[in-house]
């Protein structure tokens, strides 16, 4: 029985890495050479989130430096429209997390001397304004969740 389990696990793991992308096409790729990788894993980018504001589609990417907001309405011509520096930044930052609600983006980080940042998105793509940046409520957090059912 143990041999059968071992063989099955081996076959399943090989099949899982042999998957191809079907009907997917890379439309845009962004990288910023001035950003540093994390000291733990050398990852520069660490989270992605998306939302619609003012009839445009936006993507959020977390990095070791902060929050990058992209207009992806025309995916092949996507562009970074806003950058918000994290309360803490640099190689100590491994993970950021985001959630949006009612025109605001909520941002947290799992490392460093971080904070809860609340960013007003209502004037995108022209501006994104940090309206709250404090560690009074949250200093570090791996994930953020908004219970939308409770309003």
Spans of model-derived segments:
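Feature marking well-ordered beta-strand scaffolds used for ligand recognition
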Residues: 18-151
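Bacterial Sec-dependent N-terminal signal peptides
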Residues: 1-22
